[in-house]
Amino acid sequence: MSAKSDYIVLIDSGQACICNQYGSVRNRVGDHGATNANISSDREFFVVSYRDYVCIFRWDGSMHRRICPGFNVAGAYFSGNNRIVINKVGGGGGFFNHDGGLNTSF
């Protein structure tokens, strides 16, 4: 793979795909049923949301961590301080540490 800055993450037919800047799929990762994806600001990892959980992936396609927040997931993204915001369907959610532990609910 080239530099990780050359890649984006798209959802295609319910599966996260690592793509080049032109949208050509390089690798499909994770389970089917993905709803959205977001890249960390340092581009070290990307997070993929599913209905009941969130997965953090590396650019080689390997999974770094699975977080099961205990609620239906509306979406997830990286915030500062190496935390992940997981939004709950219907409102609320939580800030989760990179290791998967809950930091703060909202």
Predicted regions located by residue number:
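A short beta-strand motif characteristic of beta-propeller blades
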Residues: 24-30, 62-68, 102-106
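A structural signal for the main folded, soluble domain(s) of proteins
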Residues: 53, 59, 63-69, 73-77
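Repeated scaffold domains used in trafficking and secretory/extracellular systems
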Residues: 1-4, 31-43, 69-81
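N-terminal targeting and processing segments
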Residues: 2-23, 28-32
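Short loop/turn segments that connect beta-strands within the blades of beta-propeller domains
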Residues: 4, 12-14, 21, 42, ...
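Low-complexity/repetitive intrinsically disordered segments
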Residues: 1-7, 96-99, 106
